Amino acid sequence: MSALQENGKSETMSNEKEFIPVRIAVLTVSDTRKIEDDKSGKTLVDRIEGAGHIVADRKILRDEREQIADQLRAWCADKDVDVVISTGGTGLTGRDVTVEAHRDVYEKEMDAFSTLFTMISFPKVGMSAVQSRACGGVANGTYLFALPGSPGACKDAWDEILSVQLDYRHGPCNFVEIFPRLEEHKRRK
């Protein structure tokens, strides 16, 4: 049980609901990584598949804001992708532009995702957690998350937040059950 679960006692897992696999695209943002040495991307792929979800696509892009935003938009337009998780480019250096690319695409941002990620990171990395700009949001009915480029950060975000919220059986609420409602604003016009 995680530290967050110990403190937030109202979480439940329903045996009455069936597991629903989610289609997830993984994007590694790096000027140097290739698939063969992409440990963070592999960490995510292994955890996604291990949980019973589907890796819909996997790519590596350089730290170029427009390229990242274009790829995010392409996945948001692809009906075979429900969720996008990127790793890398969330720090403070001049080349770290993943967060800006995500925010170029978001229709709504999930502020609590950043907060929860920082809470999870702090006991492990201490004050270094202040340098993370992990974020999450929604665009075109697709969830998007930007994680730091370390395998540990990917593991923590998946194990503590994403695996729980992407499991339809989790209560009192989860991301999967509100998929059909993400684009309600478009139907009202």
Regions found by a protein language model. Name each.
Residues 1-189:
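Non-catalytic beta/alpha edge segments that cap or flank active sites
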